[in-house]
Amino acid sequence: VPALIKLFRDSSKIVRETAGTALICIGQPSVNPLVEALKDKDFVVRCHAARALGGMTTDYQIGRTWVRDANVVDALIATLKDPDRAVREDATIALGMIGDSRAIDALLEAMKDGVVKRHAIASLGMIGDPRALPAVLDALKGKGIKQEGTPTPGCIVSEDAFIKEAAATALGQFRDPSVIPDLIMLLKDGVLREKAAQALTVIGDTAIEPLIAFLYDPKASEVEAEGERVLSYASVRLTAKDALRLIVLETLETLGWSPPAEEVQISSSKADNLRVDRPLGDTGRFGPSGDVAKSS
C-alpha cells in the first residue's frame, strides 16, 4: 500500500490512476494510509487520495462497497476546506460516491463555495437524502448563483447552466414526485431540457400524468418569443414549440406511455428535420443570419 501511494507522485497520469485503482481493489487495508495521504504536502497526492477513497477511477463507484468507515467520511469532510480547489472538488465528489448521509450538512455548506457548488449538488443527488432537496431545488431555480453580464440567447456564459444541469440531474436521483412540475417547466429551456427529461425518466411513472397534462395544455407549453428566436437560428432545427413537444413525447415514450397514432406521425416527421449532427455544409446555411456556407 505505501508503495502504491508513492506512485501518486509519478509524472504519468496513467500511473497515478492505476495506483489508485489498485488501492481500491486492495480494499480495507488501504483506508488508513489513504486518509493520511489527504494531509500530504503535495496537492496531487491529496487529489488522488480523495479519488481513491471515493472510488473515482476508470472503475467508478467500486469504492462504495467498502469505504463506509466514519473516519473516511470525516477526513473527506475536513478536506472540503483544503486550500487547493482541485482537492476540494475531488473530496466533494468522493463524498457523493461513498454515499454516506453523514456528509449532507458538509455538502450543503460546500454549496456556498462557488468552485465546488455543482459538484456538491451532484453529490447530494448521489446520496439522495431528502434533507438536501430544498437546497438543490433552490439551485435549479437559480438562487444563490452569481452571474456577471447579460447572457447571449442560447449561449452559456457563466457557471449558471452547469449548476442547473447538476441540480436537474440530482433532483431526478431524489425520486421525489414534488419536483416533477419544476422539471417539466425546465423542458422549455433549450440548454437544460435534456437533463430535465433524463431526471423525469429516473423519477419514473409518477411523471407520466403531469407530462401528458403539460403536453395537451396549450398555455402551459407556450414558448417565449426569445426562445423561439434562439432555436430558429439554424434552418435545420425545429421551431422551439415543436422541439418542446418532441422532447415531451420522447420522455413519455421512455416512461412507457404510447402516444396516439397522430402524435407518432407528427413527432417522426418533425424529428427527421432535427439533425443537429449534420455538418453545416450539408445544409449550406448557418448562424442567425442564415448565411450561405461556401466550399473552400
Where are the regions a protein language model picked out?
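Alpha-solenoid HEAT/Armadillo-like helical repeat scaffolds in large eukaryotic proteins
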Residues: 3-11, 33-41, 75-83, 106-114, ...
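Structural detector for internal amphipathic alpha-helices that build alpha-solenoid repeat scaffolds
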Residues: 6, 13-28, 36, 44-68, ...
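Amphipathic, positively biased hydrophobic alpha-helical segments used for protein targeting
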Residues: 30, 110, 207-210, 251, ...
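N-terminal compositionally biased or targeting/leader segments
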Residues: 74, 105, 181, 277-278, ...
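Terminal, low-structured helical/coil segments at or just beyond the last alpha-helical repeat
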Residues: 254-273, 280-281, 294-295
